[in-house]
Every structure is written in C-alpha cells, then in structure tokens.
From Swiss-Prot:
Protein name: Glyceraldehyde-3-phosphate dehydrogenase
Binding site for NAD(+): 11-12, 110, 169, 302
An annotated GO BP: lysine biosynthetic process via diaminopimelate
Keyword Membrane: no
Natural source organism: Pyrobaculum calidifontis (strain DSM 21063 / JCM 11548 / VA1)
InterPro entries: DapB_N, GlycerAld/Erythrose_P_DH, GlycerAld_3-P_DH_AS, GlycerAld_3-P_DH_cat, GlycerAld_3-P_DH_NAD(P)-bd, Glyceraldehyde-3-P_DH_2_arc, NAD(P)-bd_dom_sf
Family, similarity comment: Belongs to the glyceraldehyde-3-phosphate dehydrogenase family.
Active site location: 140 (nucleophile)
C-alpha cells in the first residue's frame, strides 16, 4: 500500500486526495493546510489527518481542528508526496521540506519545469518518469493538448506541426478576486504562450505554437486546434484514434453537446463528484480533415483534468505498475469513460 501525503488541499489537492482514497493500492496518510478554513474542516470530516506548519498549529487548535503534526511529520510518514500548493510554493517547499528526505515528490504545472527531473503526462511519457524522485504533472491546458496529440501519435498518425488557440477561463468558480469580468485579455500578448514550450517538455519533438486569451467564464477552457499531419488522412482515422484513446470523450451536437457548460451539467447528472469532467471533451462535429490538415475544438476542465495524471505519476515514481495497467486502474477507479478504450 503506497502511503501518499498531499501538501495543499485546495482546488487540485482536495481532488487528488479523494482520487488517491479510491485506489486499492494507495492510502492518504494526511493533507497539509496552512489556513484553518472550511476546506480544512472538510478534510478532517473526510477522515484525512490534517497537518500544518509548526507556527500555525495553535491557529488550528483555536479553530477546533485537530492537527496530526507538522509538514515535516507528513513527509516522513509518506512514500510519495503530492504537492498541490499554489504556484511557486512547491519550489519553496522542495527547498524547505523535501530535499533532505529521500521520498518521491509530485509537483503541479504551476511550477517551472526545472523543479523536477521530468514533466509528466501518462499517455505521453509514463515510462520516462518511472523511478524519478521529482516529477511535475503539467498544467491543465498542457495536459489537454498533450492528450490530443498523444492520441494521434499512439495510433500511428504523425504530426508535422500543431497550432493551438486557447480561450482560457478567467478564474476557477471559487476565485472571487480574479477575472476578467467583462473583457477578453491576451494571456499573454506575446506569441507563443507558455503552453507550447510546456508541451515540448513532454513531447520534445513536436513543432507547436500556442496563443491564449482569458475570457470571463469559470467552467472550462476551450481549445481550437490546427494540426498538420504527416500525410493525408481520413476523418474516420482521426475519430477512431480519439475514440480508442483513454481520457478523451467524443461529444456530438446531436446528443445535446453544444457548449462547454453542457459537459459540466452532464458530469453533474452522472453524479460525478463536484461535477468534474477529467476527460478532454472533443466536439466530434468540429473534427475536420482536409488532406493532411486537421481542425478540431475541445474543452478542458481545469479543475479535474490533471487528477488522473497525478494518480499515475504516483505509481510511475515508485515503478509499481506498467503504464497501461496504471492508466486503466486509475480510470476505472475514478469511473471515467472506459468503454471502447484501448489500454495497451
């Protein structure tokens, strides 16, 4: 049984903790919170031991939250630590808590790539991460792009170049201090956005350029992709590649999928926790092939898409399961769409 500690119990961390708790080969030994807020109380109510920094223990006690120990205590009790701290805090934690303890550590895409030995996406480079001490799961947008490109590559469809245009959600649903509210903001104005170079930390030989804007929504990101293939292909070939690849969902307008909000509503109706949609949501009707040119649009649920990747990264770090066994095990445990998917 792999003992997993989760440092940071916010948007991503709480989802990772819940996902780890569903694995039959892992258990959550504790989570780190720095503020004694409602999320800390929920963590305790879910049965996760709560840890914090040594100088914050008294604040938690005053708030009526039992503290199991310090950050150092949790790291010592863990086989693998998943750091889901806010951007750049993971690097600080590495220097402050992690370097001196010989464990395995998983960081998130908000950290720069050099925080880890390898940037990770399960479909693309699971084996490259096996046995690594420091692994970085790439960001939500990078995960979405990498999955789409990997679906093609894994099915023998080569890529000459990819040009991806991203409409980023302005904030997560709970982020009341972020925006925009009534604007469309180049994010950044310069080309490329950071997503293309980030994809290349995983798929190192892909010719990719990305551009992004932030828009006043909270539900999901939308990607509009132009991909030049290695030669003429049929639309059916591309659709079959997406249909067979895990963690990709093909949505039909005829079935009622006409917007990103409908994916979230679908997830709620399915009874998925928090209305999460970890799959890349590809609009089947948008998939267009003209000779060697592929066009498509797809949605990326920023709050949950990286969660299955983190579970697989834990196994990769310890080298306990082969790639496809881990991916299938994770997908089934999280009740992702597995019918018709190829795990080999």
């Amino acid at each position: 049984m792999i003992k997993v500690g989760v440092v940071g119990y916010g948007t991503i961390g709480k989802r990772i903790a819940d996902a780890v708790a569903l694995q039959d080969d892992m258990r959550v030994v504790g989570v780190v919170k720095m503020t004694p807020d409602y999320e800390a109380k929920i963590a305790a109510a879910r049965g996760f031991p709560v840890y914090t920094a040594a100088d914050r223990v008294e604040k938690f006690k005053k708030a009526g939250i039992e503290v199991a120990g310090t950050v150092e205590d949790l790291v010592k009790a863990s086989d693998v630590v998943v750091d889901a701290s806010p951007e750049d805090v993971g690097r600080e934690n590495k220097e402050k808590y992690y370097r001196q303890l010989d464990k395995r550590y998983i960081f998130q895409g908000g950290e720069e790539a050099d925080v880890a030995e390898v940037s990770f996406n399960a479909l693309a480079n699971y084996d490259e991460a096996r046995g690594k001490r420091y692994i970085r799961v790439v960001s939500c947008n990078t995960t979405g792009i990498t999955r789409v490109l990997s679906a093609l590559l894994l099915n023998g469809i080569g890529i000459r170049k990819a040009r991806i245009f991203i409409a980023r959600r302005g904030a997560d649903p709970k982020e009341h201090k972020k925006g925009p509210i009534n604007d469309v903001v180049p994010n950044p104005t310069a080309v490329p956005s950071h997503h293309g170079p980030d994809v290349q930390t995983v798929l190192k030989d892909v010719d990719i350029v990305t551009m992004a804007v932030a828009v006043p929504v909270t539900i999901m990101h939308m990607h509009m992709a132009y991909i030049e293939l290695d030669g003429p292909r049929s639309r059916d070939e591309v659709l079959e590649a997406f249909a067979k690849t895990p963690r990709i969902f093909l949505a039909d307008v005829g079935s009622g999928f006409q917007s990103l909000a409908q994916f979230i509503e679908y997830a709620r109706d399915l009874g998925r926790p928090r209305g999460d949609f970890p799959e890349v949501a590809v609009f089947r009707d948008s998939v267009t092939v003209r000779g060697d040119e592929l066009y498509l649009m797809y949605g990326v649920h920023q709050e949950s898409i990286v969660v299955p990747e983190n579970v697989d990264a834990i196994r990769a770090a310890l080298g306990v399961l082969p790639k496809w066994q881990s991916i299938e095990k994770t997908d089934k445990s999280l009740k992702l769409f597995t019918e018709g998917k190829r795990y080999a």
